[in-house]
């Protein structure tokens, strides 16, 4: 059963104009980060491509520790505030959440993937419906119910 079957929804063949305009909406930041991984780092569609080292060089006044074992708030805020055009949703066919994903390494450069910091434990149907071509997702979660 695909993700659409899980949510009791049929896959739409084409996006209508109302869906392709605007920006994607997220209730869960960790889902947004997973989508950013796909669009920015895997498919190279979402620009600018965020790099914590370049960001730290441009914002020396923030004194960003690029060897951090904790969340770099300015980096997290960049992703939190990033608008993702709805037109890119059609390109998301799979999500592969992994502790080594670039999006996470740009938020916590020395993250070992062993805690629940980026776990995707909650997901709403309104969030997932934005991705009509999403067929497969490998997620990080601590919710095994």
Predicted segments — roles?
Residues 8, 16-17:
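A composition-biased, non-transmembrane "mature-region" signal
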Residues 17-144:
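LRR N-terminal entry segment and analogous cap-like coil->beta motifs
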Residues 1-10:
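Short acidic, low-complexity intrinsically disordered linear motifs used
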